[in-house]
Amino acid sequence: NIYNKMKYLIKFYTVLIFLTIFSFKSSVADTIKIGLVIPLSGENKELGESVLKSVRLAVNDINDESIVIIPKDNQNDPLQTLEVSKELYSEGIRIIIGPIFKKNTNNLDQLSDDLIFLSFTNKVDESKKNIISSGVNSISQFNAIKKFQTLNKIERSYLFAPDTSILDEIKIGLKKSKIKLKDKFFYDPDPTLITKQIEDVTRYRIRKQNLADEIKRVENSNEINKEKKIAQLEKLDTIGGINFDSVILADFEETLKSVATSLIYTDIPPRRVTYITLNQWFDKSLLNEKMIQPIYFPSVNYDNYQKYLKRYNNYYESKSNQIAFLSYDLTGLVYYLLFKNDFIVDSRIFYEKNSFKG
């Protein structure tokens, strides 16, 4: 009858409404929100927008609707970074990708320790436990160089580093990685002084004089075929061994090239010792310096980087940059760690031993 039909319909729609509400609540509960603190206004707006695009590209590639990115504009200002981070925390967010620049991490230790920042900086700051430096820092690079030393049986590396603001970061990397060095030299990066400093530390003038003395000795000797020996000696630049089998040039751009060129001038070319430097994958001009080849350095997976650039360009019809590339990887890293932890947001996933490498 009509009464029974009405009762049935009321029960049916009540159950349907309940299931819909339950499904909605489950959907909300299952949503994983990740903060993104970047400059979206001001002079660094273009950089911030590129990072945002890269993060959205990563989320699209992950293809999991439970991941939601909440971007906030920090205006590249430390105080604004603190404020927007508080807002994100109040919204229940416990993982934030960003900020980009180290200065914007200055006030973040005022926030709760269960709010984790994956900062783009490569500067290591052990005093701030809730900030993870996600950039390619000196520790990871020296660890990679250690592996390269082992694989290539390099045992006596001489470190050359500039006496500038980056020296503290380099020293942290040396200490934490426990890399073995034959010796180290910190130079003044003034281009007018570099060659003289390299001459001194490599004993160039002594080795040069050794050659002159040897030529003179052979000239005054009664050795057989001394003319041939003299001709061979005159093809050399120096005589005398060096007590290292490799150089680690912890510098960048033109100063790096100046130091490498000075080493070649002092008769220590890359065919004689192995040239190693820090991360240079973004500097294509280094590959054009034929004299200093081969030179080895830690790098991202170059093939994957090229694939990313192509995908970004196809998606947005614009070029990405290195920082945006890092944000793409960070998004994938966060998702991977959450996946391993059954999507339970817990700061410990970033600190447990062997949870991830980077």
Which residue stretches match the model-derived regions?
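Extracytosolic ligand-binding ectodomains
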Residues: 2, 9, 16-18, 24-358
